[in-house]
Amino acid sequence: MTTALDQLKQYTTVVADTGDFQQLAQYKPQDATTNPSLILKAVQKDDYKPLLEKTVKAHASKPVGAIIDQLLIAFGTEILKIIPGRVSTEVDARLSFDTEGSIAKGRELIALYKEHGIGRERVLIKLASTWEGIRAAEVLQKEGIHCNMTLLFSLAQAAACAEAGAQLISPFVGRIYDWYKKNAGSAWDEAKDGGANDPGVKSVRRIYAYYKKFGYKTEVMGASFRTPGQILELAGCDLLTISPDLLQKLHESTEKVERKLSPDIAKESDIERVPVDESSFRFLVNDEAMATEKLAEGIRAFAADAIKLEKLIDALR
């Protein structure tokens, strides 16, 4: 029997969401995504301590931020030896409200990859989908530096990213699901509120329809999944980035996978254009409690993990 993972690959580009590159080869993903939390998790494993120690030793005289950049590039370089496509490398979350700082960091990361013989076409620079992050992406994209817009929880963010010409967006499914489930409390009914009615699934479906209806070239990559069911509800999305645990579950399953999203159906959507000027963007994101809370929470969490990584590196110097 064909696995659910192989069936999914007929409709969607499968991406591995991990810093643990030793797990990659068995699932044959096209691309891979990383973030500060995933890199922190990886370097705490014995398998990756030699890479961490080698990187810190080679750049010990540099500021800790520069060593983190070198570590991100080291992981990205190893990942690109395994996958045929692109790796996503994230800009420090503490720059989420700093357009110029984000632009500078994006350029630095691409320059470091170039020093390792890796062209910009194989790298996506991950930026938070704040107003400032989106403006940074607009500049970087015009320079030929492709951007992956992360921490995306609303149609307003997605619309602004598309207008800015971002290469790709990563709308978060699981974190949206978490918020609605937590806020519903005892009223949550998984049978009724999950599956096709899952708030995270519905959010990505809506964004996908918006992009296809209005002809945007920006790629939609569903992210942050909790279950195989959430993934399969989005079969047909441009890309889906999936953790190794869930890739394994899909690999073990022979469940029949049907295409749920397609450009032709999406183009028939009655969805309307969203204003993307700064005041409208800020109001619309603020008006959606889930998006506001999860964006802020996500930035705090990624920033906290960057600080933990700094302390880990300082302890090795």
UniProtKB/Swiss-Prot annotation:
Recorded GO MF terms:
transaldolase activity
One GO CC term on file: cytoplasm
Claim: RNA-binding is one of the keywords in the record: no
Query: This protein's superkingdom?
Result: Bacteria
Q: Which organism is it from?
A: Paraburkholderia xenovorans (strain LB400)
What are the catalytic residues?
126 (schiff-base intermediate with substrate)
* Cleavable signal peptide: none
Q: Which protein is depicted?
A: Transaldolase
Q: Where in the cell is it found?
A: Cytoplasm
- GO terms (BP aspect): carbohydrate metabolic process; pentose-phosphate shunt, non-oxidative branch
Could you tell me the EC number(s) of this protein? Answer: 2.2.1.2
Q: Which Pfam families match?
A: TAL_FSA
